[in-house]
Amino acid sequence: MKTFNIIRKQLLALMLMAVATAGYAQNNSNRINFGVGALYERGFDATLSVEHETKNHNAWEYFANYYIKYDKDKEAGHITMDSFWKNYRTWGLGVAYKPCVYRAKNAYGSLRFGGSMGSDTDELVGWVNVGYDQNYVLRRGWQLYWQVKSDLCINGKDLFRTGVVIGFKIPTGSR
């Protein structure tokens, strides 16, 4: 009976230690992200970013973005190299906060709120960014993600841009 009480106390202490220990899987990790996507109307988007994850999969993202809007060539009547690459393009630098709203075993989803500034090769342009990221955790910390994004453009030719981006996240190994 005495041995049973000792074992019971040891098991209880072990269970309390397991419950009281905080899990730090992927907290405070950094990633390099690259994504490409299609945006309405007639646009393509490429984003390179650094993401710093804080507690509970919330994250800060610092990004560089390039957007190109193509159109038909007026003389040829179809899309040409010049009407694709030289029609309207913007680049921008920005920051976004991404609070986690959904978690599963190997997936999580985050809202994305941010702002950015850049140029359309003629003048200063700004954006208010809103969206949703869905992330799937792969081996060795890599992640695959898709993102629904909407941008409110300030001082640009587009008022709204919305679309879908797909990309991957590479862990940097730093915490």
Question: Across the structure, where does each feature detected by a protein language model lie?
Answer:
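Cleavable N-terminal export/targeting peptides
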Residues: 1-29, 172-175
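Short stretches within intrinsically disordered, low-complexity N-terminal or propeptide regions
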Residues: 15, 20-24, 40, 98, ...
